[in-house]
Structure formats: structure tokens, C-alpha cells
Amino acid sequence: MMARRDPKPGAKRLVRAQTLQKQRRAPVGPRAPPPDEEDPRLKCKNCEAFGHTARSTRCPMKCWKAALVPPNFGEKEGKENLKPWKPQVEANPGPLNKDKGEKEERPRPQDPQRKALLHIFSRKPPEKPLPNQKGSTESSDYLRVASGPMPVHTTSKRPRVDPVLSDRSATEMSDRGSVLASLSPLRKASLSSSSSLGPKERQTGAAADIPQTAVRHQGPEPLLVVKPTHSSPAGGCREVPQAASKTHGLLQAVSPQAQDKRPAVTSQPCPPAATHSLGLGSNLSFGPGAKRSAPAPIQACLNFPKKPRLGPFQIPESAIQGGELGAPENLQPPPAATELGPRTSPQTGTRTPAQVLSGDRQPPHSRPCLPTAQACTMSHHPAASHDGAQPLRVLFRRLENGRWSSSLLTAPSFHSPEKPGAFLAQSPHVSEKSEGPCVRVPPSVLYEDLQVPSSSEDSDSDLE
């Protein structure tokens, strides 16, 4: 059994000795593998080379001494532009490239023109001398700012104006501005409405026709009365307040040239509504013309900031019946009352902040009447020929306790037994002075009777 296991032990020892000798004799440098050992289908994971695996002894990653440094093939010029801001010039440019380079190197003839255009568009163009440059620069001096750009002058020419006319128009506009500033805002609209009158009405001397549309927009305004300068109206106003003369003087100062073409215009506050003070003779009348019938005047009343008080009765147009110019007091109802608001009967009487009319809105026969009656004299409005409304008459009666009561005469039955001439004879002439919206009356018989503080307080309590 032992012979079968080691038949020749000495032979094995000999083979081992021979292999060791061969290894010692082998060269130290790398030896090329045989061509049959390389397999191109194999790839090494360490060096990523084909022909051997990672466990092969031919891998340079396992034997560092045998690893070969990859050769340096040199830099490739012309592929990488290290300095893009400097174009690379070829050593031997071709004929086409040479011509192209010469064209680019040549200065362009349009460069100075382009520079000029850029300079013009980047900044303001130089100012060209214009024929009206002096006037335009003077007018735009106030627009110049130290840090802002200069104004651009257009080529549009302004119309040449006579220096005398321009100076006169400038002074006229300044005077008009001062006059309008001095007047109340309610009178400004009235002045503008008076300037819109037609030339035909001014020449014929007819009463001024104020359109209803103007009354809608204007609201509370003073009443304007147009009087022809060459003739006096038949039923004109007896007394003209000082405010009207002052306004007339201001209008003459504003428009000195227009005096020959249009008549004088006087403005006076019309009687306010039934809740405010009304002066004696404060109503102005329109004189009838020679050719045309005088239309019904439109009275725009001033609205004061006081608390409005509505009267206990309203007078429709159908209930208004006849009246004559000789009546104690004639009032023409405005035809545009339906547009301005509810129709209220205009009341007349003297009422200042310290005195109040006791029964100015009471119906007739409210208190016993005395045989003596006094009525304030007012200017008479002529009845309109085309309008069915007729003048109203208000009668003031003196009561036993010293108070006054007013009654509206709308029917012939309410006429007093005395004649209208008696009222006119008894009524004193009162000169009034209007200062702004408040109307003050100098002492008179009617003024003394109404100036009772107790009666004013009682009248306020009765009205409330």
C-alpha cells in the first residue's frame, strides 16, 4: 500500500529544484505575453485596458515597476481659444481670408456719420434759431428747471397780436379777475349769464330773456336787470340800491370797450324764499320793450345757510287771478318754479337778524284786521302777455297788539275797501342799502312798528 502512494519520491524533488532555478534565471524586466494569451474580449477593471483581467499579472496596476508612462503627444494648437478677446491671426492666410481682413481693417466711411447720429439721439439736438424764438423762450422761462432738460420748441407759429391789444387784454383780464374775486361766488355766474345776451335784445331795449337751462345750472343767483341807455322803461324800479351802482361801476371798469355796444347791467339780489329777509323795494322790474312784449322774468333766489321753513300754503298758477299795476304790491311768479323746486309764493317784508315778520305766511282772515292798513311799496312787474299767470298782491295789516299780518290777495273778494291809491299814498318812500346778501332798511314807520323783540319771538313760536 505504501509503495503505491510514493513510487518515486526522488523524482518529485528533482522537478521542484528545476522550477526554482528557472525562476531565478528569468529577467527582472517585463516580458511580453505571448500573442495567444491576449483576448480582446476581456477588459481589466483596474486599468480599463482590453486583453487581460484584473487578476492577470500583466496588469500594470499590480506591478508598478513595469507600468509605462503614457507618452506626451504635444499640445494641439488652434482648438482651444485661451484669449477670446484677441483674434488669432493665421501665419499664412489664404487669398480670400486676406481680402476679408483688409476690408475689416479699412476704416468705414459711415463711422463718422453713425457717431453723429448717436450723438444727436443720445442728447438733445442743438436749438435752431426760429423767427419767434424770443417770444417762445420768454413764455417757457417758468418751465425751466436747473436739473431738467431744456424744453423742445415746436414749429407751430403763434398768431401775431398787436402789442397795444395784448396789453389791453391782459389788463382787462386782470381787472376781471380782481372784480370776480371781490364779488361773491353767486354773482360770478350772473355776470357770465349777462354777457351772453343777444345783440338784438340789446338794441331794441327789451327785457333780458334768461334761459331756463341757465337757471338750472346757476342755482341761487342775484337777479339781473337790463336797462337800455337811451330810453327809460315805463314800469321801472323806483329805487336802485347802492350795491347795484357799485356793481355797475365795476362792470364799466372791466369792459370799457363794450359799453357802446351793450346796455348797462345792474345786479341786485332778488327777494329770497319765504323763510328769509326781504327788503322793501328790493324787487327790480323789467321795462317793456317797444317791439316785443316783456317775458316773465325768472327770479333766482339766494339760499342762505339758515334752516328752511316751508309756508303753510302754496299758490298754484290756476288760483292766481287778476291784478293791476296800481295794487299795493305786485309780484310775478317765476315760470320755472317747477324746475327749481316746489312752488312757494314770494313774500315781501322787512326782516333783519333782529326782527322777524310775524304772520308773513299765514292764510287770510287769521286775525282781526283794523280799519287802518299799510302796505309796503314795491316795484310793479308787468304781466306777461304769453303767460297765463298774473301778478300777486300782498296786503300787510296792523293788528291790535302792534303786530303785523300779511295776506295774499288772490281773488277780488279779498280786496280791501280802500282804493289802491290810498295804499300808495300812505306808504312811505324807503331808501334801502344792500350790503352783501343781508338787506338793511333805514328807520321808517313800518320799520319802527316791526322792531319789537317780543313780537319776533312770538312769531317764531307761531311758525314752529
Swiss-Prot record:
Ranges where the record places region Disordered: 1-43, 71-294, 312-386, 412-437, 445-464
Biased composition (Low complexity): 180-197
InterPro entries per UniProt: FAM90, Znf-CCHC_6
Stretches with biased composition (Basic and acidic residues): 74-83, 97-114
Pfam families attached to this UniProt entry: zf-CCHC_6
UniProt feature, compositional bias: Polar residues: 344-355
Recorded coiled-coil stretches: none
Family indicated by similarity: Belongs to the FAM90 family.
Protein name: Protein FAM90A1
Organism: Homo sapiens (Human)
Lineage: Eukaryota, Metazoa, Chordata, Craniata, Vertebrata
